[in-house]
Regions:
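Non-catalytic scaffold segments within catalytic domains of secreted glycoside hydrolases
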Residues: 1-61, 70-393
Length: 393
């Protein structure tokens, strides 16, 4: 059955600067992916902004994006590089001229090497440094932003980088997790105040990475409790003392073993379990409703779906997933939950962090030799939904 979303619902796509722009001087530069590629040239977005702007505008009236901190600011408290500022401003002006709602993300994983070398968010001294960066972001780009994320998936950044040791700086220390969490939550609150002082009417929040975490057997009880109570619960709480909405990403269900706690599964293991899956996780669209209801009950704030998608080369599966997820989201809205926006991850295939470019989420295909973008069938499907506010049968 076809379903209709309310007038004013926000449809768009989401990207991260580090995954689409050539690496400048951030801590992901030169990282080798699981499939052997080096994190350097990603999708040449900085050279193809005009073409990419047309793609973005074809996929809805909103765009969630970040900027490369390392390109903009070359040292702590330093002035922004004027040519980079102008480059970003021209792109933002193009989006605004087309009526695009811009959600500006101030921190999406990648940090300048100078920031990392000083200890990053393991040190309280990082807080004023980050606030200074955000103050300059407001000065140069605030007029273009329609809404803000202070941090993208801070829990994912913390756990992957300081507990599981999968992201830079590859640490595995729970006490460091707590220290980084404390500093990032304080930074969030300081930046929230800064943004609301400058633009009181523009909504501010984070994007929380979510999955459905369930133990694979009775032996996984501790991992399940830890993931739900600490990761989905306590960490999220720290960023919602000051927030105008709950932003959330969702990708599937993670079956938990006793140890080690794992965030990303493998197709081989998923196939052995006999569950439907993409290249990273179990396909579990009803789970987005579980998380939405949980956050609605816990925080009582409007909910924005800041990322949702499927990692696969099977585009028919991607189309199916968009339909399935939107039906679940619509059902939650029918129950009275205030959901304002849906940003699909992602507009075009990008460099999927430590996994590499072979892990594809895009509505457009990226040829990683020529960097040419070509639309997949899912692009037309999602574009029609965004244009009509209607999900077909």
């Amino acid at each position: 059955m076809a379903i209709r979303f309310p007038d004013g619902f926000i449809w768009g796509t989401s990207t991260a600067a580090a995954q689409i722009e050539t690496a400048f001087d951030h801590q992901w530069k030169g990282v080798q992916s699981r499939t052997g590629e080096y994190f350097q040239r990603t999708t040449d977005h900085e050279k193809r902004r005009g073409e990419d702007l047309e793609i973005i505008c074809s996929l809805g009236k909103a765009y969630r994006m970040s900027m490369d901190w390392s390109r903009l600011q070359r040292s702590a408290y330093g002035e922004f590089h004027p040519e980079v500022v102008q480059e970003y401003r021209e792109f933002l002006e193009g989006l605004k001229a087309r009526g695009i709602h811009i959600m500006l993300v101030l921190h999406h994983f990648a940090e300048p090497l100078w920031f990392t070398r000083e200890g990053g968010f393991t040190r309280a001294t990082a807080i004023p440094v980050f606030v200074d960066f955000c103050r300059k972001m407001v000065r140069y780009f605030g007029e273009y932003a329609s809404s803000w994320n202070t941090f993208n998936e801070p829990g994912g950044y913390i756990m992957m980088g300081y507990f599981l040791g999968i992201f830079p700086p590859y640490q595995k220390n729970f006490f460091t997790v707590l220290r980084v969490l404390g500093n990032m939550s304080k930074a969030h609150e300081a930046v929230y105040d800064l943004l609301k002082e400058a633009y009181p009417d523009k909504p501010v929040g984070i994007s929380k990475h979510t999955m459905v975490y369930e133990r694979e057997s009775a032996l996984g009880w501790f991992a399940e409790q830890f993931s739900n109570r600490f990761y989905l619960g306590y960490i999220t709480d720290q960023f919602h003392r000051k927030a105008d909405f709950v932003g959330m990403s969702y990708y599937g269900r993670v079956p938990l073993k006793p140890m080690p706690i794992s965030e990303i599964d493998t197709p081989g293991r998923l196939a052995k379990r006999g569950v439907r899956h993409d290249d990273m996780w179990e396909y579990y669209p009803q789970g987005i409703g579980t998380i939405i209801r949980r956050f609605h009950e816990r925080y009582g704030l409007p909910i924005w779906i800041t990322e949702n998608g499927l990692c696969t080369n099977d585009d028919a599966f991607r189309v199916e997933s968009i339909r399935d997820y939107l039906h679940v989201i619509h059902q939650c809205m029918e129950e009275g939950i205030d959901i304002r926006a849906y940003f699909h991850w992602t507009a075009w295939d990008n460099f999927e962090w430590f996994l590499g470019p072979q892990y594809r989420f895009g509505l457009y295909n990226t040829d990683f030799q020529t960097m040419e973008r070509t639309p997949k069938g899912s692009a037309a499907y999602f574009s029609a939904i965004a244009r009509t506010n209607r999900v077909p049968d």
